Amino acid sequence: MKILLAGASGAIGQTLIPLLIQQQHEVVGTFRNPAHAARVQSLGATPLVLDALDARAVTDRVAQIKPQAVINQLTAIPSRIDLRHFDRDFAPTNQLRTEGTRNLTTAAANAGVEKFIAQSFAGWPYAPRGITLKTEEDDLDPTPPPQLKPSLDALETLEHTVLRESRFTGIVLRYGPLYGPHTSVALGGNGLPDGSMIEDIRHHKIPLIGQGTGVWSFLHIHDAATATVAALNQAQRGIYNIVDDDPALVSEWLPYLAECVGAKPPMHLPNAIARMMVGEHVVALMNDIRGVSNEKAKRELAWTPKWASWRQGFREALG
């Protein structure tokens, strides 16, 4: 199968290309920065410099390539996110998820693409109520903190854009918070630095806010890639949560991660002080978000995460 992988130089893209090549797919990998060409080519894909925000260029290139499938992994997430200015740091990614996705879906539909897979997110967008794990049928948060609203709006726009197009099979993968190579939760090596979150934990910059009652559903970067391959091979139109099997309280995973990287336990910060220092949205991420179920993906995609628990993944697979 000929596949156009948009965002090939990103964390998931770099992990995904070799898996697609192993299955004998022909991959054209796009990226905006020409400096990424050698890396994408070394992984086995045909490199292509393409600005997803240039609608005419996207239309022309997709028509020339004539892929059977498009995989949209477009992001522009900075290597270090200032959570106090979450909306600012995610603005370029939000633009790619709205305008870039619109350009890609229009071009794909006009070019006869059969399947379109797009990256979304399951980490915090679900409504923070109830105690059961969130499924694909549950509502997203109708009243997110203001700092998170632009990103949630962009994710909803992306999902609607992909799923409403009738000329191809639209698939949305809601990945959990990622860890492992090329992510912010990664150990360095081979000339690469630690991920920014690991650096901050080592320097005691990430406190445990409040009681740490937020529930996170993590995902190793390798499992994000294998789930994407499974979706390419088997998925029907719809949304799939892609997370591990072990939802985790912040009060459990944050001290454990600190221990795994040889850092001191995180300090505690009361909610009231944290609201003043970093904002209500960070307090919500630490205390309010709910865990996510992967049962649909396991059942319908015949997919199982290799790193079924963040506990093993943090110990063995950060680098």
Regions found by a protein language model. Give the residues of each.
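Substrate-positioning beta->alpha
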Residues: 150-157, 183-198, 209-232, 238
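Conserved Rossmann-fold NAD(P)-dependent oxidoreductase catalytic core, especially the SDR/UDP-sugar
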Residues: 81, 85-146
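NAD(P)H-binding glycine-rich loop region in Rossmannoid oxidoreductase-like domains
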Residues: 32-41, 45-103
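Amphipathic terminal alpha-helices
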Residues: 308-319
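Mid/C-terminal beta-alpha module of Rossmann-like enzyme folds, strongest
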Residues: 2, 15-18, 225-281
